[in-house]
UniProtKB/Swiss-Prot annotation:
The gene is pfkb-1.2. This is 6-phosphofructo-2-kinase/fructose-2,6-bisphosphatase. It comes from Caenorhabditis elegans. Residues 1-244 are annotated as: 6-phosphofructo-2-kinase. Its EC number is 2.7.1.105, 3.1.3.46. GO terms for molecular function: 6-phosphofructo-2-kinase activity; ATP binding; fructose-2,6-bisphosphate 2-phosphatase activity. Residues 1-20 are annotated as: Disordered. The active site is at 124, 154, 253 (tele-phosphohistidine intermediate), 324 (proton donor/acceptor).
Length: 457
């Protein structure tokens, strides 16, 4: 069957972005440089920012100078990066080693960006002196790379102590070499060594310098000379993240009439099995007693019915952005119908499922774009339950699981299952609850959802 004129897919008529996240009209590789004393959350910010940029389509990589330093240590000097004296400004030999580690990281970063492999590089190190930052700026100018600084400033002892206790004492510098108490004492001495030479970012350093200061884990910010799309996205993201204890629950709606018939999209109501799941979901959260839980629901009938038995004080909001991927002219069809009527469309979708756009409909790439405000709100909020659809939840899970975009359309999300995500400093815990409709019992596993066996769904 021929596609009606004007409905051919899949490329937009505006400038298309390549696999590195750049428009075909302009390509400016970006270097994001972290600044700050140890235990200020620089690596946490680097990893979260890298995940976000990759999810939005920018090929991004973190270059952590500490890892280069540790790789430079030989077997006879395994502790050479751990002892606080190594970070003393008076330790000339150590300064040479640290400078060489930074140089190697910068060279690898430039190779990554200039080879066309990457679009954004994050240079994760303390970079606490003006001299060190000037070296980076001059290097980036020579390589024609756009440079943006992120300084994490913190004078809250509780935040610093939490970061040192929860993260640093278990870092590769200390693990297996010292007790937790020894590691903490040594790391606090390391911080004191850095303080002796710390020069905070300031516009007087260079009026043209582009930077953002993140103060006390996001309580306030200072932004200066932001340039370009990437830097604007970075600022937008940093102003929305936090690391307070919380959980994010994700579930598809219960089985709908279209699900039972194998049809795409539509707005059909729940089947009897779907209604059972809706009741069981309400019972689950009645028992869990999640404090301050908010419910975000798609505007489709099947999603609203799934959330209808939840307690009124959960405060349910209905988001158009959470609606299922629009299958366009294929809405209401089965996959067999599509193969028979639109074989070329079926083949195009199988070839590149992430970028494929249904005629008069959407692609997964489009869904990611409309979900960005949802992700930002999820980063800002406390406990949230999201009731939505398979394609939408694949996009959300790919973000929190840090899955590549090529895997995103294949994350297997069964009906009548609930995913609990608990964000941590450097990863996200995932627990899956599956409901047995006959017994009404939930089974629990701690794991990420796998990829689908079938490339069709």
């Amino acid at each position: 069957m021929e596609i009606p004129p004007g409905l051919e897919t899949t490329k937009r008529k505006v400038a298309h972005s390549d696999e590195h996240g750049f428009s075909d009209q302009v390509r400016v590789p970006n270097v994001i440089v972290m600044v700050g004393l140890p235990a200020r959350g620089k690596t946490y910010i680097s990893k979260k920012l890298c995940r976000y940029l990759k999810w939005t389509g920018f090929t991004t990589k973190v270059f952590n100078v500490g890892e280069y330093r540790r790789s430079d240590a030989n077997a006879a000097d395994a502790i050479h990066g751990a002892n606080a004296s190594f970070f003393s400004p008076n330790n000339a030999d150590a300064l040479k080693v640290r400078a060489e580690s930074a140089r190697r990281a910068m060279e690898d970063m430039a190779d990554y960006l200039n080879s066309g492999t990457g679009g954004v590089a994050i240079f994760d190190a303390t970079n606490t002196t003006k001299d060190r930052r000037r070296i980076i700026i001059d290097f980036c100018k020579k390589q024609r790379l756009r440079c943006f600084f992120i300084e994490s400033v913190c004078d809250d002892p509780a935040i610093i102590d939490c970061n040192v206790t929860d993260v640093k004492v278990n870092s590769p510098d200390y693990k297996g070499l010292m007790t937790a108490e020894q590691a903490k004492e040594d790391f606090m001495n390391r911080i004191e060594n850095y303080k002796k030479q710390y020069e905070p970012l300031d516009e007087s350093e260079d009026e043209s310098l582009s930077f953002i200061k993140v103060i006390n884990a996001g309580r306030s910010f200072k932004v200066h000379q932001v340039r370009g799309h990437v830097q604007s996205r970075v600022v937008y993201f940093l102003m929305n993240i936090h690391l307070l204890p919380r959980s994010i629950y994700l579930t598809r709606h219960g089985q709908s009439e279209y699900n039972a018939m194998g049809r795409l999209g539509g707005d059909s109501p729940l089947t009897e099995d779907g209604q059972k799941y809706a009741s069981a979901l309400a019972d689950f959260f009645e028992e869990e007693e999640v404090p301050g839980l908010r419910v975000w629901c798609s505007q489709k009938v099947r999603a609203a019915q799934t959330a209808q038995h939840l307690k009124p004080d959960f405060h349910t909001e209905y988001w158009k952005a959470l609606d299922e991927l629009d299958a366009g002219i294929c809405e209401g069809l089965t996959y067999e119908d599509i193969l028979q009527r639109y074989p070329k469309q079926a083949d195009d979708r199988a070839t590149d499922k992430y970028h494929y756009r249904y005629p008069s409909g959407e692609s997964y790439e489009d869904v990611v774009s409309r979900l960005e405000p949802v992700i930002m709100e999820l980063e800002r909020q406390a406990n949230v339950l999201v009731v939505s659809h398979q394609a939408v939840l694949r996009c959300v899970l790919a973000y929190f699981y840090d899955r590549p975009l090529s895997e995103l359309p294949y994350i297997d999300i069964p009906l009548h299952s609930l995913v609990k995500l608990t964000p941590r400093a450097y990863h996200c815990d995932s627990t899956i609850y599956a409901l047995d409709l006959e017994s009404g019992e939930w089974t629990e596993t701690s794991d990420q959802l796998p990829l689908c066996d079938s490339p069709r769904d």
